[in-house]
Amino acid sequence: MYAVVATGGKQYKVSEGDIIYVEKLEAEVDSTIELDKVLMINKDEGLVVGKPVVEGAKVKAKVLKQGKAKKIIVFKYKPKKDYRKKQGHRQPYTKLQIEKIDA
C-alpha cells in the first residue's frame, strides 16, 4: 500500500516505513504528526484518487530530525563593473518516518 501526500508545496509518494525529507514543519522531535492532504491511495482493493483529497484518509508520521540542508552559494556579478555579491543559503527541512497510512 502506498499513498501520495502533499506538504510544503510538494507531493511525495510514501509507504509505511519510508523516510522522507519535507519542508520545515513546526513539530518537536520524536512527536507524531498527521498529514491529512492525501491525494491518492493505492490499496489492495484498488486505486482511490481524491477530488482533490481523499476523504477521511490520513498518514501518520514520526518526526526524526529538524535540520538544515547543504549550503548552496548564490553568486551574482556584472562584468566590467566591479559588482560581485556572494550569498549562501541553507534550506531548513524536517525528516519524517511514515508510521501508518489510514484509509
Swiss-Prot record:
Cited function: This protein binds to 23S rRNA in the presence of protein L20.
Species: Clostridium kluyveri (strain ATCC 8527 / DSM 555 / NBRC 12016 / NCIMB 10680 / K1)
Gene expressing this chain: rplU
PROSITE patterns: RIBOSOMAL_L21
UniProt family annotation: Belongs to the bacterial ribosomal protein bL21 family.
Keywords in alphabetical order: Ribonucleoprotein, Ribosomal protein, RNA-binding, rRNA-binding
GO annotations of cellular component type: cytoplasm; ribonucleoprotein complex; ribosome
Pfam families given in the database record: Ribosomal_L21p
Keyword Ribosomal protein recorded: yes
NCBIfam families referenced in this protein's UniProt entry, alphabetically: L21
Protein name: Large ribosomal subunit protein bL21
Gene Ontology MF term list: rRNA binding; structural constituent of ribosome
Taxonomy, superkingdom: Bacteria
Gene Ontology biological process: translation
InterPro entries xrefs: bL21-like, bL21-like_sf, Ribosomal_bL21, Ribosomal_bL21_CS
